[in-house]
Amino acid sequence: MLTIDKWGRKPLLLIGLTGVVISMSICTYGFKQATYQVQQTAINEIQQDAPSVAIKLTPLTNDIYYSDVEFKRTLKTTLTSDEYDAYQQPLLTSSINMNAPLVLFGIIAFVASFAMSLGPVMWAMLAEIFPNQTRALAISLVGMVNSLTSFLVQVVFPWELANLGAAATFAIYGVFALVSLILVAKFFPETKGRTLEEITEEFERSA
């Protein structure tokens, strides 16, 4: 917020969205390069509580999987439904071989990019881009759509991870960010230092 009047709204949005695209690409690459292999140490731990499960998993120690979806699909066909529900997460955690610092950097970069641009700047721009006669209603509608979208993302995210995989999930969000970057660069006006009437006139000319 300290730089919003100094740098302008649109530059901050472009910088933030560029950061989101890059961070999502980093996460996508990190998960795309990951491999999965059941470790003997994990089987030894399971052996203490469920010997039958350990016996089923032992042949998988010779296989390497290059997708979390493929790995989880194999676990589903190897184990019963109850066994899969009980051991899927610990097996996934112990079996993954990935560049964790790279993915962590991507996630932190996303949080930073969002916090410096989309988070605060969006609400500042909403108060400036709508005409006076419809501003209150428009901001309310946008707020409702934003809340609904956030809710849907939280609901859909686990399904995406389970069915599409982590790499594809982050790639999808990266594509949405890239589309947003293009739309902001092409259609959004800079509102810094301009009156509401001037902004409204520019939208009317563009229409």
Locate predicted features.
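Alpha-helical transmembrane bundle of multi-pass membrane proteins
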Residues: 1-207
